[in-house]
């Protein structure tokens, strides 16, 4: 699967500080990547109703992490997926009378266009589930051969395959939830804890036997069917990055059961106790009092904002004005503030000189290194813009150019 064009990232003088992020599994700030090669996996979209502000908030946040790593001088490998076959996609295709493959292709292309518009660095490894089916089949076969999975007769013939969580004593270490909370979230987020015959209610689906009217693939030894959700990301991450890797990223609603189960699969498949050194999760974006959600339909789409004439960098700044791991609400005021900020920064940057640029570079670097504190980074640039527009500070030739390159390179905001 092809990704989107990479934006040009300006080179800045010096190097950035080591970036620390909040690890969900431990609740502590940790160095995001300790070696010279940083490896990141971020769960991608299920391609329908792309790309809403919840998506954008997540991918912009991890884009800042990638940019900070590059500023440190690290080599970065970024992997992501597209869940281009899944129940919600199939349900939407049926409801709209569109072939599921056409819907997935159209929405994946729209997502790529939106990421290009927002200046997001594309993944180096970008794979759809459909193209990864052979690798998923091999992983499920391996789990069965190790007695870490089992078969359960499907209603229409053939066998579904489930992971046996008793093979992984580490299950639960990512989200750190009580059993009752895990059961509730499993039922809410695509699991089937009440299915009869399962060894444990939380055992996740690895392979779904063919059902009438659903896509399926031949899999010798498994029978025709399609992959379960969690094993897809486990396979794409391990194939694209190797195990262990540095950061597993995604929205906070993916911590359980998705990231919990993917990590479990990788532990059993690879024998690696901690497949991702850190799990980093972004907050939820709300709109009109509820989490922005495809099921609720309360979506604000990037493409619609841009079609309505909103400056793309204002959309990006609206996201960056909030701490990545905090929940926040999209409002007209949030957008208006971001639009005013873009205009103000551009006025301040329009001259040949201005206040000293080095404090801005140092301040933005320090903010980004401190758990991607983009609101603090914006405040640093705001202060410089205020001083520049007031014209009451010593004048430094070329300062606006350095500031513009700083916000472009580290925040992805092109002036």
From Swiss-Prot:
It catalyses: 1D-myo-inositol 2-amino-2-deoxy-alpha-D-glucopyranoside + L-cysteine + ATP = 1D-myo-inositol 2-(L-cysteinylamino)-2-deoxy-alpha-D-glucopyranoside + AMP + diphosphate + H(+). A motif ('HIGH' region) lies at residues 45-55. GO terms for molecular function: ATP binding; cysteine-glucosaminylinositol ligase activity; cysteine-tRNA ligase activity; zinc ion binding. GO terms for cellular component: cytosol. It comes from the Bacteria. Zn(2+) binds at residues 43, 233, 258. A motif ('ERGGDP' region) lies at residues 188-193. A motif ('KMSKS' region) lies at residues 291-295. Keywords: ATP-binding, Ligase, Metal-binding, Nucleotide-binding, Zinc. InterPro entries: Cys-tRNA/MSH_ligase, Mycothiol_ligase_MshC, Rossmann-like_a/b/a_fold, tRNA-synt_1_cat_dom. Catalyzes the ATP-dependent condensation of GlcN-Ins and L-cysteine to form L-Cys-GlcN-Ins. This is L-cysteine:1D-myo-inositol 2-amino-2-deoxy-alpha-D-glucopyranoside ligase. It comes from Cellulomonas flavigena (strain ATCC 482 / DSM 20109 / BCRC 11376 / JCM 18109 / NBRC 3775 / NCIMB 8073 / NRS 134). The gene is mshC.
């Amino acid at each position: 699967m092809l990704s989107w064009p990479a934006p040009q990232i300006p080179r800045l003088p010096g190097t950035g500080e080591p970036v620390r992020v909040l690890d969900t599994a431990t609740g502590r700030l940790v160095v995001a990547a300790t070696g010279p090669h940083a490896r990141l996996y971020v769960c991608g979209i299920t391609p329908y109703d792309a790309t809403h502000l919840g998506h954008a908030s997540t991918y912009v946040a991890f884009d800042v992490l990638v940019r900070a790593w590059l500023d440190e001088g690290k080599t970065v490998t970024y992997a992501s997926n597209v869940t281009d076959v899944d129940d919600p996609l199939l349900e939407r295709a049926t409801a709209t009378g569109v072939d599921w493959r056409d819907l997935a292709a159209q929405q994946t292309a729209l997502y790529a266009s939106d990421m290009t518009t927002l200046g997001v660095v594309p993944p180096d490894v970008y794979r759809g589930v459909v193209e990864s089916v052979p690798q998923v089949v091999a992983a499920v076969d391996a789990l069965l051969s190790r007695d870490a999975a089992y078969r359960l007769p499907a209603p229409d013939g053939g066998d579904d395959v489930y992971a046996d969580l008793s093979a992984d004593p580490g299950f639960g270490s990512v989200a750190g939830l009580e059993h009752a909370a895990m059961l509730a979230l499993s039922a809410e987020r695509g699991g089937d804890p009440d299915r009869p015959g399962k060894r444990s209610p939380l055992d996740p689906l690895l392979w779904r036997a063919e059902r009438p009217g659903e896509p399926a693939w031949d899999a010798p030894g498994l029978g025709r069917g399609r992959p379960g959700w969690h094993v897809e990301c486990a396979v794409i991450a391990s194939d694209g990055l190797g195990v262990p890797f540095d950061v597993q990223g995604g929205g906070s609603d993916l911590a359980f059961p998705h990231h919990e189960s993917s990590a479990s699969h990788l532990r059993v498949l690879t024998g690696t106790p901690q497949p991702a050194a850190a799990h980093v999760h972004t907050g939820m974006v709300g709109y009109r009092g509820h989490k922005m959600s495809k099921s609720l339909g309360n979506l604000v789409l990037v493409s619609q904002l841009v079609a309505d004439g909103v400056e793309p960098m204002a959309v990006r700044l609206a996201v960056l004005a909030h701490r990545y791991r905090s929940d926040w609400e999209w409002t007209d005021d949030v957008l208006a503030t971001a639009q005013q900020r873009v205009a103000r920064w551009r006025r301040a940057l329009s001259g040949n000189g201005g206040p000293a640029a080095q404090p801005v570079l140092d301040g933005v670097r320090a903010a980004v290194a401190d758990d991607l504190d983009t609101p603090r980074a914006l405040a640093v640039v705001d202060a410089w813009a205020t001083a520049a527009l007031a014209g009451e500070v010593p004048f430094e030739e070329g300062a606006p150019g350095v500031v513009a390159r700083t916000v472009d390179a580290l925040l992805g905001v092109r002036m």
